[in-house]
C-alpha cells in the first residue's frame, strides 16, 4: 500500500538509535524521501528482461534496496539470483523476504558464521566458474569496497555491472554543501 513505509536502520549514532526505537504509528517530525531515481529496470521492456539472467549482489544494508528490485522483477515473472554478503550471521538482513522472491539465494559471511564463508566475489566466481552459471547483468549495492571488487571481477568476466552511488551521497538534498 502507498501509505506504508518500511525502514531498515543500522544503529550507529543517536539519531539512528532513536529511529530504531520507533513503533508502528509513531511519527517523524520531518521526513524526506525517497530520493534518487527508480531502478533502471522499470524503463526496460519486460519481455526483453525475461530473456536475461540477472545477478544481484547485496552487501550489508545494501540488501534493503536490492529487495524491492528483485521483488519487482519476480512479480513480472523474472527470476534473479541474489547474493547477500554480511560480516557476521547477526548482520544478515531480509533473508526470509529475499527467499520468497529470488530465483536462487546465496548467503555468505566474512567470518563463516553463516552460509558460505568468505566474500561475495568468491560466490560470484564459484557460480560462474564452478557451477557454469551465465549472467547477462549484475547489480551490486553495498559498501564501496565491496562494489569495487565486484566490478573488478565482473569486468574480468565480461559481465555488465550496475552499482549504487548512494554511499557517496551525504544527505541527498545538497543542504550539506557537498
What are these regions, as identified by a protein language model?
Residues 171, 176:
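Short cysteine clusters
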Residues 1-5:
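Short, small-residue-biased leader/transition segments that mark boundaries at the very start
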